[in-house]
């Protein structure tokens, strides 16, 4: 066996492939690296790469999670419809049950999402599958 490279292991998407970038503008991800990477410190599990909608954002604000208002002190620009963002898997699932779930980029959605939402449900919202 070879020596460890010191690099973290490749994280995989829900399709079992290396995870692709979700968004750099605005920069997203729990680690603010543009990817929906996750790890032990991500207690809220933010692995879902979604294209936000007005309906989802309004629903999120009414549930107490304001993703719209800029918070410059945290480097958060505020989000708008059309932005891509790494969402909490449980929040996406709740939005799905309420009929407000945004569409997804499965190639940029971390495989940990499958612990909350089945792949057949995710595929119904995929923007990047032909």
What is the meaning of each model-derived region?
Residues 46, 81, 102:
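Residues that flank catalytic or metal-binding motifs in active/ligand-binding sites
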Residues 51-66:
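Short, basic/aromatic beta-hairpin or loop at an interaction surface
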Residues 92-115:
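Short, compositionally biased
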């Amino acid at each position: 066996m070879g020596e460890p490279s010191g690099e973290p292991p490749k994280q995989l998407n829900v399709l079992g492939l290396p995870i692709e970038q979700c968004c750099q503008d605005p920069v997203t991800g729990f680690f603010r690296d543009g990817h929906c990477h996750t790890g032990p410190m991500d207690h809220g599990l933010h692995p879902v790469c979604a294209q936000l909608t007005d309906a989802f954002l309004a629903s999120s604000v009414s549930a107490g999670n304001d993703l719209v208002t800029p918070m410059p002190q945290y480097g958060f620009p505020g989000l708008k419809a059309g932005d891509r963002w790494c969402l909490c898997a449980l929040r996406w699932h709740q939005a799905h049950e309420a009929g407000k779930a945004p569409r997804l980029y499965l190639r940029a959605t971390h495989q940990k999402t499958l612990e909350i939402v089945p792949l057949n449900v995710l595929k119904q919202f995929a923007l990047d599958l032909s």
